């Protein structure tokens, strides 16, 4: 499937409630994981306040998707994101089709203050975000 103005390619991970979960086949940028909160935020709150979430759902979404394509995207998780990072659970469910040549962020959840990432061997790990830069591999949920 090709979506977006620069023809990013996507891998189908699974069907989910009448929609299809896709992961971008490549890293589209690299960032540190930062939040707007002072101190350490954990899990869901860290994602809600993160610079990566803001970038994906503003600059990335508007640059790479037409209005028609945006209308096909289903809002995901309690933050209503149209573009997001996979959670550790979503990654675990599709790990056999996910290429891990570089490190890339996963979406934090739960109560850990250390966001997860995928290492070059394909393992999901955690470390404190402010010190490291990892790749961004967007995920989308598309209405069938």
PLM regions: where:
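Collagenous Gly-X-Y triple-helix signature in extracellular proteins
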Residues: 1-144
């Amino acid at each position: 499937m090709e979506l977006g103005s620069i023809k990013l390619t996507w891998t189908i991970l699974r069907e989910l409630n009448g929609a299809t979960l896709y992961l971008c086949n490549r890293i589209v940028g690299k960032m540190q994981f930062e939040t707007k909160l002072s101190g350490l935020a954990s899990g869901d709150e860290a994602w809600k306040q993160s610079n990566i979430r803001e970038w994906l759902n503003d600059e990335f979404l508007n640059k790479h998707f037409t209005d028609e394509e945006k209308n096909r995207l289903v809002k995901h998780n309690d933050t209503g994101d149209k573009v997001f990072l996979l959670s550790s659970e979503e990654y675990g469910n599709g790990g056999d089709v996910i290429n891990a040549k570089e490190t890339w962020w996963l979406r934090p959840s739960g109560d850990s203050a250390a966001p997860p990432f995928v290492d070059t061997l394909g393992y999901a790990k955690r470390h404190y975000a402010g010190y490291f830069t990892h790749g961004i591999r967007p995920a989308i949920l598309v209405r069938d």
